[in-house]
Amino acid sequence: MFNINPLENLKLYISSRPPLVVFMISVSAMAIAFLTLGYFFKIKEIKSPEMAEDWNTFLLRFNDLDLCVSENETLKHLTNDTAAPESTVTSGQARTSTQSPQPLEDAGPVNISVAITLTLDPLKPFGGYSRNVTHLYSTILGHQIGLSGREAQEEINITFTLPTSWSSDDCALHGHCEQVVFTACMTLTAHPGVFPVTVQPPHCVPDTYSNATLWYKIFTTARDANTKYAQDYNPFWCYKGAIGKVYHALNPKLTVIVPDDDRSLINLHLMHTSYFLFVMVITMFCYAVIKGRPSKLRQSNPEFCPEKVALADA
């Protein structure tokens, strides 16, 4: 009669074949890992590795900039130069143009306006401006926000349009100039190659963003994080001025994610791989339960001697 003792066979299999047991445990862990990873790809939106930079990462680069609004800076009264130059086109015009796209070398600068949070932190000696300031202007190079290659030497003109005017009246009201926070319209003017080619953030209209009829523009200087922490850093860089900081909140709609079809395909491959590994482990487990200890014992075992067994039985 064929008698199977599963528990005893399993114990004998574990004691006689430790390497195979370790292999089974490793394969089981790998199968569970593939199964978990496949489920993760199924329910989670994964950022596409093919797109190195989107508008979220691009706008976050400006968070490391410090803008100095100097008290000695000359106010420029702007009344007739608000229109963009003929060589400059807005992003909306670039999208609606029916002409064939120009080569990258011949393309003119592009204007893109996005809403951004701007904080102005006046230092103690700063007394504010008697005029109503509604626009801040600065020019930086691409390497100041971490761009590399040809874009590192490209100029980027930045114009902040404030929703309300900023003057010394607020300073007189509080006895000193306090930090102010604006949701400003930031207009970036640069070569098209500087900007990401992904989905753009919602645009704002600078001309209608400020309710001031007569406005003044302040030219500001900018420094990046490398300059700020360099050995030759000037502690009086923005003496008697206000330091401006830009903050961009992450917008999930701007992140380029892996398409649903690709995620489903990845999940399918991982599931098939995990099923195959599970079948392998189950097959080895069934073999251990049925077969147990190998029938042929090692001849090198000194305790095993057929002659001694025969004499003992006699």
UniProtKB/Swiss-Prot annotation:
Subcellular location(s) per record: Membrane
Gene Ontology cellular component annotations, sorted alphabetically: membrane
Location of region: Disordered: 79-107
Top-level taxonomic group: Eukaryota
Main localization of the protein described in the UniProt heading: membrane
Keywords, alphabetical: Membrane, Transmembrane, Transmembrane helix
Membrane disposition: Multi-pass membrane protein
TM annotation in the entry: 21-41, 179-199, 236-258, 270-290
Keyword Membrane: yes
Pfam families xrefs: TMEM219
Chain intervals with Polar residues compositional bias: 80-102
PANTHER family: TRANSMEMBRANE PROTEIN 248, TRANSMEMBRANE PROTEIN 248-LIKE
Protein family: Belongs to the TMEM248 family.
Protein name as catalogued: Transmembrane protein 248
Species whose genome carries this gene: Bos taurus (Bovine)
